[in-house]
Amino acid sequence: MAKQKIRIRLKAYDHRILDQSAEKIVETAKRSGASVSGPIPLPTEKSIYTVLRAVHKYKDSREQFEMRTHKRLIDIVNPTPQTVDSLMRLDLPSGVDIEIKL
């Protein structure tokens, strides 16, 4: 019999909110009787934007901004129907993007 697996990818700009959400998911899955591997930290994406400080000229004067996207991966192996139901009801912060693959 093939093992069922739920793979959850979390993305957020703030790593503290991301870690709290991952901890909530792991705790909920373990409480409902599924085995969990993770949260596994994935590489952080860093987007750098360069902007001219002056409006018209002075191209040598620039300012750089960066956005960091932190990611985590959680695998839930052999989930029960109770696990899926409790994960559907879980309330997570608004700054976290969730991708779920079955």
UniProtKB/Swiss-Prot annotation:
One Pfam entry name: Ribosomal_S10
PROSITE patterns attached to this UniProt entry: RIBOSOMAL_S10
UniProt cross-references to SMART domains, sorted A to Z: Ribosomal_S10
GO BP annotations, alphabetical order: translation
Protein name: Small ribosomal subunit protein uS10
UniProt cross-references to InterPro entries, sorted A to Z: Ribosomal_uS10, Ribosomal_uS10_CS, Ribosomal_uS10_dom, Ribosomal_uS10_dom_sf
PANTHER family with a match to the protein in the record: 30S RIBOSOMAL PROTEIN S10 FAMILY MEMBER
Domain of life: Bacteria
Family, as annotated: Belongs to the universal ribosomal protein uS10 family.
Organism: Listeria welshimeri serovar 6b (strain ATCC 35897 / DSM 20650 / CCUG 15529 / CIP 8149 / NCTC 11857 / SLCC 5334 / V8)
